[in-house]
Amino acid sequence: QAAGAHGVLLMTSDPHSSEYLPAYYNSLPFFSGFTGENSTLVVTLTGSALWCDGRFYVQGDRQLAGTEIECMHAGSAGVPTVEEYLTAHFAAGQTLLLDGSCVPATIANGYAAALAKSGAKLESKDIVSPLWESLTTRPSLPNTPCELLTVEQTGATAAQRIAMVRDELKKAGATALAVTGLDCVGWLTNMRARDLPCTPLAVAYALVTMDSCTLFIAPGRLNDADAKTLADNGVSLRDYPELIDTVHA
């Protein structure tokens, strides 16, 4: 309400489109009490609804019982989709907020189209992070030690893989690639960590241009020897949050 919006949408998602989220990005359990996966929460000034898939129908019903949040069994007969709900519950001139960095463009565009049917609009604004941090201690970003695998383990150096990416950029008529998937960052740099359960990846981005490659990762996560190996392979280091500003520059 303070942001001048009628509602906000939260998804089980992060800026890397990860299947398993770092606790830092997993806001849905805190705001809804629902601890399942692959869910979407819409909170408006007049009501709330959470969509979960068939694995979590029973869990959702139990965890949301006694709250104002309606548990939507996604895919069941008679249950509206998120898009149908938005069209029905937003009127002309009203706004839905979401954190655009954590919602894929194709999905966000679908929400925008659904809102437009009733004259409402979508706006990318993160109101969840400041609210979360004002109410409790938000989990920190993962900070497990990172290490580089050897070329004997991976079959190619980071420099060779960067060259492969540049060849593909030329074919596509492009000049840069923002690498956001954690598995893709790991493949490109040969870097591994333990930031996610059962997944040997580090929370990081990479940006490949025709003359540079930058790894965006929290300072201190790589030891000096591995940082030098990356530098020798043409990879420079910048802090994790600096990707957007770097792209804009």
Predicted regions and their residues:
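Acidic beta-strand-to-loop metal/phosphate-binding motif
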Residues: 94-101
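N-terminal accessory/capping or targeting/presequence segment of soluble
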Residues: 1-90, 103, 107-248
